[in-house]
């Protein structure tokens, strides 16, 4: 997979959430739980994925696909509800 992100957004995300957008790409190397974000019209299809960075850190990554490239929009630690969703999904995945 190819990834891209806005460099200014990467800096802001790292300062705010302690996770770089480059680091966030790692979740796609393992099982992820993904759904389409339909909360509002973003003028593009945005997806939300929950996955792990290593064995213990579970994060949420917002992304979109543009011409075959996954553009990372944001990344942050999960909240309690998101961790539960992720764990339930992973247990169901063979």
Please name every model-derived segment.
Residues 1-94:
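Ribonuclease/tRNase effector modules and their secretory precursors
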């Amino acid at each position: 997979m190819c990834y891209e992100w806005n460099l200014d957004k990467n800096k802001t995300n790292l300062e705010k959430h302690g996770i770089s957008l480059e680091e966030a790409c790692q979740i796609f190397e393992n099982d992820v739980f993904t759904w389409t974000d339909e909360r509002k019209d973003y003028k593009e299809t945005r997806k939300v994925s929950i996955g792990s960075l290593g064995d213990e850190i579970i994060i949420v990554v917002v992304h979109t696909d543009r011409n075959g490239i996954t553009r990372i929009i944001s990344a942050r630690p999960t909240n309690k509800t998101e961790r539960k969703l992720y764990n339930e999904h992973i247990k169901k995945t063979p």
